[in-house]
Amino acid sequence: MKLKSILLLLLLTTGILCTQCDKNTSNFQQIEKQTDAIYSSLVKIRRDLHVNPELSKQEKRTSQIVADYLRNLGLEVKTNIGGNGVVGILKGGKKGRNIAWRADMDAIKTDDPDVVDFKSQNKGIRHICGHDVHTTIALGIANVLSQQKENLEGTVYFIFQPAEETFTGAKDMIADGLFDIIQPDEIYGLHIGPEASGVINVKANELFAYQKTLQVKFKPNTNKKELESFMNAIVKGLVRTIEQNGSPWDIINKISDSKVGLTNKETIFKDYFILQGGRLTTEKEDTFYNASFLETDIKRVNSLPFEIKKQILDSKFKDSFISIEYAKDYSGTPLNDPELTKIASQTIASFYTKKMLAPLYGQAPYFGEDFLYYQQKVPGVFFFLGGSNVEKGIVSMPHTPNFAVDETTIKYGVQSFAALILERANSK
């Protein structure tokens, strides 16, 4: 009798799982068709945004395009949040989970010439971080999900953020009452990365290394030459794992290297300390030693000031020492919720080609993302979406002079993440 009960339970469970799997597949197939139907219009939007890039806190034209597009879809729209921020609210036909999706809108100052035919018309400004693509993908997701309204349970919030490049936009929107307007249970977002177009990368916890500047204050009458030499020796002794030969770009170029990069289990980017520079400065009557570095381990980040202070107090400079502290952060790393990362990965894998979902095993250096400020309020996951196409000569490494994105990435982004949001909104 017990065996029969177990077999019956297994059959019922299998049936439920298969039904859910079939539902996921059906929804995704419908989303694929809807995305295909709007793809050419999305490419036009992306190219228009690329031709007319706007710097941080100047995204008026972009935010107007976004707001008009969302209104035409029938969404409730809020504007001028934290500056040029826009929020679109899509309410489903039934009650369910509330899911937020965030995209950034600003461009970057650069004198490097554009590498695409639809070149920037704003001199010295380009979208070389892919925010034009991020914005377009988010609009595409909003379009597709508005067509799925009868299948949507819960509410989806679309956050279009200004000033990501200055690391102020998220904080500005939050300070201006963003979370009074929206009440998400989960939040998601993405950034274009150097993998092949459509490849999704994700990992739990930190995506990037922590970028910190340590400031040590000394009395003014200290022997500056000896002090700088002493402090340089301390911080150089902290360096580990990654070779310091070459420029930062030499290290960054290894990120997508299949042998040592982030998608390899034996990646060199798992555990490291990279010293970006250390120097002595004098301000008024005080002497400061400033050291900037990248560190993967938050415990090490927290313990370093105490370790360095101990070495100073054990040295001949102990009587000159005044204080040690971290300077204000202008960068940081998203901190992906482990449980949501697992669930989101499994959900995407249920309808997306398996080889297109590649886990990460390390933390990228030299990058920052203010998406982390949303994650301090709501559990969430931040993804990388590959945009490169080697055969076409397209390399989507952010902030590089030849940055470009294969526009099929827009289609992949809309399809996969619209399906993810739908499944998460409808989840119990």
Positions of PLM-derived features:
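Active-site-adjacent substrate-binding region
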Residues: 236-270, 331-387
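Sec-dependent N-terminal signal peptides
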Residues: 6-14
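Acidic/His- and Gly-rich active-site-bordering loop/insert found
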Residues: 22-127, 136, 148-152
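Midchain, well-structured core segments that form catalytic/ion-binding scaffolds
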Residues: 184-313, 322-333
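Divalent metal-coordination and catalytic microenvironments
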Residues: 49, 70, 88, 101, ...
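His/Asp/Glu-rich mid-to-C-terminal helical/loop segments that flank catalytic regions of hydrolases
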Residues: 225-244, 385-428
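Acidic/histidine-rich catalytic neighborhood of metal-dependent amide-processing enzymes
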Residues: 133-206
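Positively charged n-region of N-terminal signal peptides that target proteins for export
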Residues: 1-5
